[in-house]
Amino acid sequence: MTSQTKLLLIDGNSIAFRAFFALYNQLDRFTNQDGLHTNAIYAFNNMLEIVLKSVKPDAALVAFDAGKTTFRTAKYADYKSGRAKTPSELLEQLPYIKELLDDMGIQHYELKDYEADDIIGTMAKRADDAGWQTTIVTGDRDLTQLTTDQTTVQVTVKGVNELEAYTPEHVKEKLGITPTQIIDLKGLMGDTSDNYPAVSYTHLRAHETCADL
């Protein structure tokens, strides 16, 4: 029996952010001779080594956001507008994280007007259709909607080295819904992190089903 091809997809911005804050209390300790902060680079590299050893992927890709402007902000200008600016100490490390990936032979990709999530979602769907076994590593629980029988989403719990594996069964156990229903739930409840509002109670009372909305 032929074994499944294994694909590893990593949410670059999300993991870099969590890597940075995992060692934020040691920020001054993690600097090189030129004054470059290295805490995110160090923690990101540790996470990579652990995940690569665990998953043993045949192919791997790290997706990054291409910028603050996306097709979503074109439709809704306030999308993610409430978020604090990315710390300069983290921004200066991102090019070196990408250089680290190059040195390890791991591909990374970003696409204008799209987020890393969009790249990961597209790649995961294509891999699923091809019968591949996919592991997604992220700090964003929104990506648990991508779980299938062949796709597992590993979400950071503490720092970047402790991960919680989400399968369709685990999503059902924790949320009481299926992965495909997460998008409906988020649409109804809104998301303060992404700065979009919930559907009002008046609208919910006026319609019997999500389809009617």
Identify the residue ranges that each predicted region occupies.
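Domain-level signal for Mg2+-assisted phosphodiester chemistry and nucleotide/NA-binding surfaces
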Residues: M1-Q107, K158
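Conserved protein kinase catalytic core
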Residues: F17, F71, T144-L146, L213
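Short, cationic motifs built from Arg/Lys/His that form the positively charged side of catalytic pockets
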Residues: R18, H207-E208
